[in-house]
From Swiss-Prot:
The protein's name: GMP reductase
Source organism, top-level taxon: Bacteria
Ranges in coiled-coil conformation: none
Gene name, Swiss-Prot/TrEMBL: guaC
NCBIfam families for the chain: GMP_reduct_2, PRK05458.1
Major enzyme class: oxidoreductase
GO annotation, cellular component aspect: cytosol; GMP reductase complex
Lineage: Bacteria, Bacillati, Bacillota, Bacilli, Lactobacillales
GO annotation (BP), single: purine nucleotide metabolic process
E.C. number(s) listed in UniProt: 1.7.1.7
Gene3D superfamilies for the chain: Aldolase class I
Species name: Streptococcus pneumoniae (strain Taiwan19F-14)
Active site: C176
Assigned keywords, A-Z: NADP, Oxidoreductase
Amino acid sequence: MLNEFPIFDYEDIQLIPNKCVIKSRAEADTSVTLGNHTFKLPVVPANMQTILDENVAEQLAKGGYFYIMHRFDEAGRIPFIKRMHDQGLIASISVGVKDYEYDFVRQLKTDAPEYITIDIAHGHADSVISMIQHIKKELPDTFVIAGNVGTPEAVRELENAGADATKVGIGPGKVCITKVKTGFGTGGWQLAALRWCAKAARKPIIADGGIRTHGDIAKSIRFGASMIMIGSLFAGHIESPGKTIEVDGEQFKEYYGSASQYQKGAYKNVEGKRILLPAKGHLQDTLTEMEQDLQSAISYAGGRQVADLKHVDYVIVKNSIWNGDASH
């Protein structure tokens, strides 16, 4: 039962250092393998319209990073797969669970993407299980990610249906208001939910949402994530598709949730909101900084590679890691 587990989130945890065994953090290897491909970092930008478009996806793939293209340009998905494959790059797309998506999956047989993410807000659903089975039947070599979920039962059921990885996180994101609108979700205890789900998982877990700092990446790995999906930290870059808006002479980029009125175009089952983020520099600068911070984390763990973060001790500090530090 959940009540037997301690409940905590990212800001409640500090990882405990081990003796360093490398001469420089540059020796630490941040790469991670998911399916048949190895990527430079265990992070993936959220598959949201204000985070990435085809150009950003291409930039990420060329740089050796994992990406998941969003599903909100449905007609553009097959041309996108061709565009990526023509350049020798991996194709990674998203699908929903509506009836027409079944025909769409059949159309992919001639040029199957390497990765498909079944992407709905409440992924522990018969509709998702049915779609996993359909993709696995039609495209047996495609790596299927399914979500989002927040319980061990959901992880096991999606894995048993054929999912190659599950995405864990219901509403912990900065622009997700599922927790407020519905009363449900992993907001405020996302890291504990990840730990709970990871104990049941036999296949990779992608932690999705609630990441506010680069240190949260290391914490996610400690509690069982193979890959971490990140929204707000990847939003607001020069390359980001979100609109640039000027307020009092300052540049901001818009960032909105996948079920917001801005994305849906109407007040219809809205579970996302729009915020403005101060415009950042280039996406590559953030990726490089993430890599360096993760290398430092690996060195503090007394390790040489990402997996070494899984074995460190931790302490629950209940919101005290920011005490005396207003800079966060």
